[in-house]
């Protein structure tokens, strides 16, 4: 969601799903954190649109392009995917975050697994599958159905397949 778009300005009756971009993963604790204070203030305003459109689902997107830029979050997804303990912490935090903000699901936007120029590692390919599988299993244990989507970037997948 662009900063200039407020939830109240989103036309209803057009979309079945909305993804709010973004929330972040703390690189030290693996807990979910708002991208900024401004985005945190919009979470509940966006999920409140569900009261005005029957069947609308709102997901939180986590990560994004600059999440793998040089800096403290560059290897966060790789570190998360490589550790079941970190995943368990992440899952607990994510579920609490979604419940608190009334989200219906999550979109994992990891750009780019395995890309060494974006902080990736060769083992990301297999670890990502395990991460998504474990998250789906964990979400399926909850009384409410939560959606899970992933953002895949085709150029990375082609790069892996070429190896």
Label the model's feature ranges.
Residues 72-163:
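Active-site cleft segment of glycoside hydrolase catalytic domains centered on the general acid/base Glu
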